[in-house]
Amino acid sequence: MATWSNLNLQNSSSPLMEQLIFFHDHTLMILLMITVLVAYIMSMLFFNLYTNRFLLEGQTIEIIWTILPAITLIFIALPSLRLLYLLDESMDPLITMKTIGHQWYWSYEYMDFKNIIEFDSYMSALDKLSSFRLLDVDNRTILPMNTQIRTLVTAADVIHSWTVSALGVKTDATPGRLNQINFMINRPGLFYGQCSEICGANHSFMPIVIESVNLKNFINWIKNYSS
């Protein structure tokens, strides 16, 4: 989860988030090199007092500063296209979960079992000081780790956005439309998210909490909830 004065990205908890962090670092390094090079050239031009009276045109340098940006864009575009493909790639999901956004809470449905499991998830009351303020909920979303998960996201009233940063997932919840996101959690723990689309007066008060457990505990939770 996000912490006070943290300027970095959240720790990765899924393969998708790892790839997003790698692409961020890759692009940032290219931008840093471009910034340093341009700053160096500008400083040299500013402090250099010599003038070349015969330099009226330079075909070579014009070719260079046309080709180099094109090559730079290719180095950014290829990893970006690969990542876009990975984000939309649909593996063979073991579990399908439906997420429905409301003003101002989330509803969840597990449809792969004998009895459909459905519940609402509201923000915990502020007088519960043992929990994180504005982030904890009364019913957590339980999911197994190391399992391919498909989430179908929609809304019942206005546009919401189901976002969990540590997993690298962000999907719009649009009324009358189903959006799909695939992910896999690679470690146990609690992962916090929030609605990322302004949806009304209480937009800031509809958090998301995913609890990642091993498959055995997940099956036990399914049995207990069904009974």
UniProtKB/Swiss-Prot annotation:
Free-text remark on how the cofactor is bound: Binds a dinuclear copper A center per subunit.
Mitochondrial intermembrane topological intervals: 1-26, 83-227
InterPro entries: CcO_II, CcO_II-like_C, CcO_II_C, Copper_CuA, Cupredoxin, Cyt_c_oxidase_su2_TM_dom, Cyt_c_oxidase_su2_TM_sf
Keyword line: Copper, Electron transport, Magnesium, Membrane, Metal-binding, Mitochondrion, Mitochondrion inner membrane, Respiratory chain, Translocase, Transmembrane, Transmembrane helix, Transport
Residues that coordinate or bind Cu cation A1: H160, C195, C199, M206
Ranges in the topological domain labelled Mitochondrial matrix: 49-62
Positions in coiled-coil regions: none
GO biological process per UniProt: ATP synthesis coupled electron transport
EC number: 7.1.1.9
Transmembrane segments: 27-48, 63-82
Pfam family name, one: COX2_TM
Stated family: Belongs to the cytochrome c oxidase subunit 2 family.
Subunit note: Component of the cytochrome c oxidase (complex IV, CIV), a multisubunit enzyme composed of a catalytic core of 3 subunits and several supernumerary subunits. The complex exists as a monomer or a dimer and forms supercomplexes (SCs) in the inner mitochondrial membrane with ubiquinol-cytochrome c oxidoreductase (cytochrome b-c1 complex, complex III, CIII).
Function: Component of the cytochrome c oxidase, the last enzyme in the mitochondrial electron transport chain which drives oxidative phosphorylation. The respiratory chain contains 3 multisubunit complexes succinate dehydrogenase (complex II, CII), ubiquinol-cytochrome c oxidoreductase (cytochrome b-c1 complex, complex III, CIII) and cytochrome c oxidase (complex IV, CIV), that cooperate to transfer electrons derived from NADH and succinate to molecular oxygen, creating an electrochemical gradient over the inner membrane that drives transmembrane transport and the ATP synthase.
Official protein name in the record: Cytochrome c oxidase subunit 2
